[in-house]
């Protein structure tokens, strides 16, 4: 699901969302390596904790979703990934890119 999501600058994203309860599925990358994947209703705190253990070259991919929809988003994406030609990952990536552009990323 996250492979087509836009790569965001971690520090800028965190500054933008400081103090918010962001829900979603997210991953941190160090250089080009995925070093952390998580999901839940407190992405900001989780990402702050993991970030402390990483080097300087960190980027973030996130598919945000409201509240209880996180699990549906993950489960739906797994179903789409299992069937070639599934549209949800592409639609999610487009939605994430539009949100990122609206926020100045």
Regions found by a protein language model. Give the residues of each.
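GIY-YIG nuclease catalytic motif and its immediate N-terminal context
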Residues: 1-49, 58, 66-79, 98-105
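Coupling/hinge elements of helicase-like and P-loop NTPase modules
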Residues: 84-94
């Amino acid at each position: 699901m996250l492979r087509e999501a836009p790569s965001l600058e971690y520090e800028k994203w965190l500054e933008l969302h400081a103090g918010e309860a962001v829900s979603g599925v997210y991953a941190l990358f160090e250089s080009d390596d995925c070093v952390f994947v998580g999901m839940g209703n407190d992405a900001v705190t989780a990402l702050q904790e993991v970030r402390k253990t990483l080097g300087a070259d960190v980027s973030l991919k996130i598919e945000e979703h409201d509240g209880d929809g996180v699990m549906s988003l993950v489960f739906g994406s797994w179903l789409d990934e299992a069937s070639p030609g599934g549209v949800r990952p592409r639609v999610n990536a487009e939605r994430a890119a539009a949100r990122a552009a609206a926020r100045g990323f």
